[in-house]
């Protein structure tokens, strides 16, 4: 795919990430020199601000009741607390797992499953003990990233479950992995932020992009663990199709 990479020995790896725990052994590492780390939430807020600047109107905290085809070529979206539906020429369904309850009454069935992931974010205690960029532990499938003056550890994905049920074992694995590779890097005892989030996937892992089969309704769903990486490209595809 044209992605530059190089296999490194432990000695070579420690020259790039010199804060790696010397007591944690590993066979080798794969270095992706062009990879970068970013704050997904911050980027989303910046995109929102830019969209508003060029005239996009957002309706936050609006609870959608149902979606129906209109008498014309678009769709009508019913909103709780409003007597009349809102008409649109086109609508894009991108509501994650909640999309199924809107699509099934329209005859559109997509075999999406919920996958939940965990993360811990904490301030850096000693910059020299923190990662320079990002490290992925392939054994536990956990990523350790540096975001300015914070460290974020993310992974421990699970199929199914609910957002309300936060497994302590999943967080223990995150803390263990951080301590394995970067002990003493962050203030875990003072305000560490624990998070659990949901995403959707199809059995084959590829997202659903394009027409739904319902006039005026388009789909942008099930990006799995690559949601941020695929977001701008998916938006470009949707804009071109619509």
Spans of model-derived segments:
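Short, conserved active-site loop motifs that form the nucleotide-linked donor/cofactor pocket
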Residues: 55-57, 151, 217
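Dinucleotide-binding Rossmann-like beta1-alpha1 core, especially the glycine-rich loop
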Residues: 1-10
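Active-site substrate-recognition segment that forms the wall
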Residues: 66-69, 74, 85-215
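Generic structural signal for residues in well-ordered beta-strands
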Residues: 5, 58, 64, 190-191
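Internal hydrophobic alpha-helix adjacent to the cofactor/substrate pocket in enzyme cavities
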Residues: 231-242
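Helical element adjacent to the flavin cofactor pocket in flavoenzyme catalytic cores
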Residues: 23-90
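Claisen-condensing/thiolase-fold acyl-transfer catalytic domains that form or cleave C-C bonds
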Residues: 143, 224-232
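Mid-domain beta-loop-alpha active-site segment that forms a flexible
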Residues: 31-48, 97-98, 170-177, 223, ...
